[in-house]
Amino acid sequence: TILHHIPENRIKDVIYFNPDDLAHPIGMNLLELPPGLEGDDLLREKDIITESTISVLRKIFSEDDSGGHRIEYVLRNTIQTALTIEGATLFTIFKLLNDSKYRREVTKTLKDEDLKNFWKNEIGKAGDFQRVKMAAGITAKIGRFLFSASAKKILEQEKSTINFDDVLDSGK
């Protein structure tokens, strides 16, 4: 393996990531909020996480996806809603879009008026067919991860087990 070619003095700097190791998956939660944030700092971090997640998922969406801007609008509001839930993961987005009972429970607790209006007016007033169509572009992309055993093990964890800022800052 490649590990045999790493100089001994650098072995502690190596992070071995094997997505097929289902017994010891690295956790990577794209929606994880740092603990202890409040007020404007929390709002700013939620915006950063929302835009970063959209950026990652945009790479999966093809440029010719019809309704790409509409998909991003729905995705942005869904991520912002997910970020109001303790321990939200990428799969929370899927659940919000596809599980009406769960969505009703979550939206009842929302304090943000814009998010309340989105779920009430955009999603709530849409017919079943329209609602499915709005969610389809997003759920098809996230569904790729839901049905991959290795991706699911990595992305469904509430706490990330690797800190990429630390990895980059420490020269690993």
Predicted regions and their residues:
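P-loop NTPase motor domains
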Residues: T1-K172
